[in-house]
Amino acid sequence: QAEPVSVAITVEMNGKDLGQRVRTFSVRSINECLLGYVANGTKFHDTSIFFAAYVNEENPMIDQLLREALNTRIVNRFLGYQSKAKGAVDKQVYALWNILQKRKFRYSSVSNTSLSSNVVFSQRVRTFDDALESSQINCVDGSVLFASLLRAINIDPILVRTPGHMFVGYYTDNSHTNKNFLETTMIGDVDLDDFFPDEQLDSTMVGKSQNEMSLLTFEKSKQYANKKYKENEEGIHSGKLNYMFLEISK
């Protein structure tokens, strides 16, 4: 909830009181990310770079999550870009995906905020702690959560925004030559047929173990997000409104 705060300013010059003015401002929740604002009635200033503020690799909960990921034995340690083995980075990323799936996240489309107006635009974003405690994420929550974990293991993440959607990417090498993308809403309990209607994937899930299903959704998440990136690549790198390619390492 927004709370009003009054600010009083008193001016004096050469010992003479020049008067006082009082302005009332609204203090908003840290969960409200400012997307942009309109100045002078016409010019829009994009502030979506503020999404980066929700990427928090220093969160105390991360150590516990990384320990859970190591306990899966998918990887023995997190080396970031140090390993030269083929697929080493993707394997580390999958270990993170796997443990988040075990926490049974659910997709939640809640993104409304009391701040948005025809002058100031914002979106509600769950903090790292909020997302873990509620086990609910939307596309933005999932992207900044996953980016936080990637940063914690020294893999450089990317936040990608298209109109009405966000997904996360990561560089697969230290030189930033190659990259992959993930559709984080697929971490939750989803119907794969919604993403791949022509493949009837849900029927192939019958009888598979939890880890087999987790790996399948991880690979399909990459496939889906990489396709979306290619379809929107021109806009993503154009600097146009509602598009964003934000490298968190920079």
Where are these regions (language model features)?
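A structural boundary/capping signal
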Residues: 1-250
